[in-house]
Curated annotation (Swiss-Prot):
<dbReference type="InterPro" id="IPR007802">
    <property type="entry name" value="Cyt_b6/f_cplx_su6"/>
</dbReference>
<keyword id="KW-0812">Transmembrane</keyword>
<comment type="subunit">
    <text>The 4 large subunits of the cytochrome b6-f complex are cytochrome b6, subunit IV (17 kDa polypeptide, PetD), cytochrome f and the Rieske protein, while the 4 small subunits are PetG, PetL, PetM and PetN. The complex functions as a dimer.</text>
</comment>
<dbReference type="GO" id="GO:0009535">
    <property type="term" value="C:chloroplast thylakoid membrane"/>
</dbReference>
<dbReference type="GO" id="GO:0015979">
    <property type="term" value="P:photosynthesis"/>
</dbReference>
<keyword id="KW-0602">Photosynthesis</keyword>
<keyword id="KW-0249">Electron transport</keyword>
<keyword id="KW-0934">Plastid</keyword>
<keyword id="KW-0813">Transport</keyword>
<comment type="similarity">
    <text>Belongs to the PetL family.</text>
</comment>
<dbReference type="Pfam" id="PF05115">
    <property type="entry name" value="PetL"/>
</dbReference>
<keyword id="KW-1133">Transmembrane helix</keyword>
<protein>
    <recommendedName>
        <fullName>Cytochrome b6-f complex subunit 6</fullName>
    </recommendedName>
</protein>
<dbReference type="GO" id="GO:0009512">
    <property type="term" value="C:cytochrome b6f complex"/>
</dbReference>
<keyword id="KW-0472">Membrane</keyword>
<feature type="transmembrane region" description="Helical">
    <location>
        <begin position="4"/>
        <end position="26"/>
    </location>
</feature>
<keyword id="KW-0150">Chloroplast</keyword>
Amino acid sequence: MLTITSYFGFLLAALTITSALLIGLNKIRLI
């Protein structure tokens, strides 16, 4: 149970960081 929770937490963090980087790159390109 604990491993599944930590896995989902890590996956959520990875998705958040990836989306943040993509949004940042798009903003830099637009400027």
